Curated annotation (Swiss-Prot):
Upregulating conditions: The arrA-arrB operon is induced under anaerobic conditions in the presence of nanomolar concentrations of arsenite or low micromolar concentrations of arsenate. Expression is repressed under aerobic conditions and in the presence of nitrate. The peak of expression occurs during the exponential phase of growth.
Assembly with partners or alone: Heterodimer composed of one large subunit (ArrA) and one small subunit (ArrB).
EC number: 1.20.99.1
Name of the protein: Arsenate respiratory reductase molybdopterin-containing subunit ArrA
Chain positions recorded as Mo-bis(molybdopterin guanine dinucleotide) binding sites: 193
Gene Ontology CC entries for this record: periplasmic space
Amino acid sequence: MKKENQVNLGRRQLLKSTAAGTVLTGIGGTLSFTPIVEGIAAELPAPLRRTGVGEWLATTCQGCTSWCAKQIYVMDGRALKVRGNPNSGVHGMSSCPRQHLSLQQVYDPDRLRTPMMRTNPKKGRDQDPKFVPISWDKALDMLADKIIALRVANEPHKYALLRGRYSHINDLLYKKMTNLIGSPNNISHSSVCAEAHKMGPYYLDGNWGYNQYDVKNAKFILSFGADPIASNRQVSFYSQTWGDSLDHAKVVVVDPRLSASAAKAHKWIPIEPGQDSVLALAIAHVALVEGVWHKPFVGDFIEGKNLFKAGKTVSVESFKETHTYGLVEWWNQALKDYTPEWASKITGIDPKTIIAIAKDMGAAAPAVQVWTSRGAVMQARGTYTSISCHALNGLFGGIDSKGGLFPGNKTPLLKEYPEAKAYMDEIAAKGVKKEKIDQRGRLEFPALAKGKSGGGVITANAANGIRNQDPYEIKVMLAYFNNFNFSNPEGQRWDEALSKVDFMAHITTNVSEFSWFADVLLPSSHHMFEKWGVLDSIGNGVAQISIQQPSIKRLWDTRIDESEIPYMLAKKLADKGFDAPWRYINEQIVDPETGKPAADEAEFAKLMVRYLTAPLWKEDASKYGDKLSSWDEFVQKGVWNSSPYKLEARWGKFKTETTKFEFYSKTLEKALQSHADKHKVSIDEVMKACDYQARGHLAFIPHYEEPYRFGDESEFPLLLVDQKSRLNKEGRTANSPWYYEFKDVDPGDVANEDVAKFNPIDGKKFGLKDGDEIRITSPVGMLTCKAKLWEGVRPGTVAKCFGQGHWAYGRYASAKFGVTPRGGSNNDLIADRYDRLSGASAFYGHIRVRVEKV
């Protein structure tokens, strides 16, 4: 058979399988047909060999926070191939490998195809929901009745909206409608993503956001756990440029495991989990003692003589700073004692190595960039690791410098819809003033996003609030694009919490672990192929805004999560007498050209995107970047690009209390003082309540906090290293066959297996060999998988990739759907702990485990 015939046969069989499969009717639901996808893998330069002529259509991948602009090759109504959008100024046609898995996502025969209703009133992991199909009208009628009942009872605050991954049209469903109903409980996933990562940049240079790294011009890259070519932000761009960067920059990766980026680096330092700040602080110490800090940015001694000597204090008046604040205070309070020898005792890293790295960074300055990652900072005391590592970017002058790092470029994109307070009645106005269910802002949970007490979300703690009914119970919940039972530490807490919610509706593409506890399932259109939306991304010195648009006809009776569903729900609420959301939608979210509201939910989905993006194409956006002539041009190109970032743009006007890069953070001092005053305690009492070790001025400077460990070392001798796969689309590729077939693209992993990786030294110690069935146990849970002996993991640790261990989601994700997991979920082992200053969940550094053969 010819290749082109094989391709078309595969496509026809795929169509047949997806049309013939059935929806789930509980655990025993029929899951027949395995799709054949030869057509997806084939190259497509000769479209005439197919049945028709194809075209590339622009969209955006929402599968991770890279938010890459894409083009979908569509022929005969089928999506066949994905590539980077060549109009992107960030990554061009480059893409990460997981883009291809999206094809298996959209054509997944196990996708939820129609609304479903629970018929088993009992909730629990061991309870078959016995879902049965219902109409959209019935599903939304049930949800609307529950919301109306809360308002009639004057308890609208007992409604909660839970958000997972989102696009920029989320504001209506996430915030506006939640507040109009009368609830403060719009709970995002952010604190299980990377909130602790933002603490260093914000409290040192005022950027509450993620940085872009000028790897094209870098001369030294120091990465604390970041894996740019596999799982860090903007993987497409870094995958394209990393090889060239290795030619002109020295790359050092600090990570307990040999990541994809570490495997290509000039030096890999397999550090003990939780000790990253030790190395960072020792490097800073050497930089000052050796006089290799970047003086044009930082400043110098007035007399020109270096007075930094290990263990000796320095007069503040002797040093004149330029664009920084508090260097000498930092030295005197802590840094003078953080010698390479001190660091070596803790980390085992040779002092000569530390000295060499510091000198190399000084020689390369200011074309120096220091990366942090989830692994280094999403720990129980991770704020200070984030601050300590980021301080090096200031010390070596990489901030806003060529070859360094800088924040995102300014764009005119709107990210919110008009204010809705005028539409709030007395019931809503009273309800939104209630404490949030995640308990943010309490003494023990500062969550200091952007310097505000309670300014950040504490996603995982919402489960504790719900299950303990503290500060109150949640009776009605709407959730979308999330699976917190699987993605949160100690996810079994969510099983308990959701079992207590009277009514929950879940918007989802697949029946997940979270869905298992739902009363109504609402099938979502796929974000990349069937949705209208808009996203942005940064990299390569520019910001891009890219569109999501339907490239194929939606396969089943699905609706778009952030537009069509809230529109339909608002109309249903209005029919029942509560018309505030409906009036707001039709009076405020109108077409930017005609001024008219949408005629139906399908038109509204596009209108929402037109509204937010109008400043790009309706107005002259050339002040910020590209000039677009029309909406149609934006849709066709799919991308708007900003002008290049202006180097040194923030020097002298950082958004900190001093307008300087703060080694002594007056910004953090102010935030902590505000939180302390709120609770009528001292800052030291705040630090104690939040389980940090710093007292006094130490709390405001980069310093070492001993890593928190959970579990007795004698019983649990190994430290867990939770890692992310380059094939993960945040856990949502688990029902893609290719995810397992190509699993060995992750260093040390094995195709079609779920393995935990042990150093051969530990393998010998615990009597393990490759392929052994093992049980890994922590103080809070256990999992089973297979052992893999591998030199790419530090002795004393066990590295395991997050992503497997589903007991729901579909036929490939689970061993037996609804019953038996395929492999093990890392989060079953990870105790519910927090970096309390940021509100971030701690996934790393603290979990001790033991291993035994099964």
